[in-house]
């Protein structure tokens, strides 16, 4: 075996139709099915199962006992061809589950790049997760949830199906959201999460200056503190968006809501 050949434990079971790039590592008792592609530099730990159709990019790490690309947990699923697509440099800790899409929901579940999904995270069918997200232990996304970039979800938090969580949002421990969470927003730790301000600390860590954060806070106060009906708040946000691309991003998110906005 050459140095750059896949390194596969003798107890692993790899379907002949699976395609593993150079230097992929596969741990003990792992199962990789047909129609699975795994990019270079990826490490699949012990006791994992990966089912196709699944496409996995470069330099990902599956620590152990992860269940990847399984059939969607949707009674309407009738065996149609659907897929899971994972980007690059993600880390999936113990017992993470990622399901493929459904025919009625677009047929695809997607995970972006540079995400960190901790133990027992579940991402259901037809979800779309962006880049640089952190999902703490037992994070649960129901079907059709969309998560923007740089979102942090704390332990035992979850999102109702079809919800959207905007970029840079933060969900506290145990928060359960049944509505859309605007970008930059913090959601509280009560049983039904409610907005609790702006994720200021996270924005500072990502290089947002005081002027940008101030504009976002003003928009938040307009939306959540001023007591305005949503239609009136949107009028004021439209004015504020002229001077702030971040406020414009919030307004665009609100305008495209399919579920009620979390308020």
Curated annotation (Swiss-Prot):
SS bonds (residue pairs): none
Pathway noted in the entry: Glycolipid biosynthesis; lipid IV(A) biosynthesis; lipid IV(A) from (3R)-3-hydroxytetradecanoyl-[acyl-carrier-protein] and UDP-N-acetyl-alpha-D-glucosamine: step 1/6
Keyword Transferase (UniProt): yes
GO MF annotation list: acyl-[acyl-carrier-protein]-UDP-N-acetylglucosamine O-acyltransferase activity
Known EC number: 2.3.1.129
Subcellular location: Cytoplasm
Keywords recorded for this protein, A-Z: Acyltransferase, Cytoplasm, Lipid A biosynthesis, Lipid biosynthesis, Lipid metabolism, Repeat, Transferase
Any GO BP: lipid A biosynthetic process
Any single GO CC term annotated in Swiss-Prot or TrEMBL for this entry: membrane
Reactions accelerated catalytically: a (3R)-hydroxyacyl-[ACP] + UDP-N-acetyl-alpha-D-glucosamine = a UDP-3-O-[(3R)-3-hydroxyacyl]-N-acetyl-alpha-D-glucosamine + holo-[ACP]
InterPro entries, per database record: Acetyltransf_C, Acetyltransf_C_sf, Hexapep, Lipid_A_LpxA, Trimer_LpxA-like_sf
Pfam families for this protein: Acetyltransf_11, Hexapep
Signal sequence extent: none
Subunit structure: Homotrimer.
PANTHER family: ACYL-[ACYL-CARRIER-PROTEIN]--UDP-N-ACETYLGLUCOSAMINE O-ACYLTRANSFERASE (PTHR43480), ACYL-[ACYL-CARRIER-PROTEIN]--UDP-N-ACETYLGLUCOSAMINE O-ACYLTRANSFERASE, MITOCHONDRIAL-RELATED (PTHR43480:SF1)
HAMAP family: LpxA
Family the UniProt entry places it in: Belongs to the transferase hexapeptide repeat family. LpxA subfamily.
Function recorded in the entry: Involved in the biosynthesis of lipid A, a phosphorylated glycolipid that anchors the lipopolysaccharide to the outer membrane of the cell.
Protein known as: Acyl-[acyl-carrier-protein]--UDP-N-acetylglucosamine O-acyltransferase
Organism encoding this protein: Stenotrophomonas maltophilia (strain K279a)
């Amino acid at each position: 075996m050459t140095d750059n050949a896949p390194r596969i434990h003798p107890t692993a079971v790899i379907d002949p139709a699976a395609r593993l790039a150079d230097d992929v590592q596969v741990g003990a008792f792992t199962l990789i099915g047909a129609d699975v592609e795994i990019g270079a530099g990826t490490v699949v730990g012990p006791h994992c199962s990966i089912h196709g159709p699944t496409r996995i990019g470069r330099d990902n790490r599956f620590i152990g006992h992860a269940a990847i690309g399984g059939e969607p947990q949707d009674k309407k699923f009738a065996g149609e061809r659907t897929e899971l697509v994972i980007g690059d440099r993600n880390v999936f800790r113990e017992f993470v589950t990622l399901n493929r899409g459904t025919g009625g929901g677009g047929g695809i579940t997607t995970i972006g790049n540079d995400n960190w999904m901790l133990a027992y995270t579940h991402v259901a069918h037809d979800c779309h997760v962006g880049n640089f997200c952190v999902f703490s232990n037992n994070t649960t996304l129901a079907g059709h949830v969309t998560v923007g970039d740089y979102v942090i979800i704390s332990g035992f938090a979850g999102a109702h199906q079809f919800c959207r969580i905007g970029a840079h949002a933060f969900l506290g421990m145990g928060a359960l959201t049944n509505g859309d969470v605007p970008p930059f927003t913090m959601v509280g730790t009560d049983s039904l999460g409610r907005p609790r301000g702006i994720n200021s600390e996270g924005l500072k860590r990502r290089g947002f200056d005081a002027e940008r954060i101030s504009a976002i806070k003003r928009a938040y106060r307009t939306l959540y503190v001023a007591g305005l009906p949503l239609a009136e708040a949107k009028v004021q946000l439209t004015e504020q968006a002229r001077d702030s691309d971040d406020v414009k991003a919030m307004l665009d998110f609100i305008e495209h809501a399919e579920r009620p906005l979390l308020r």
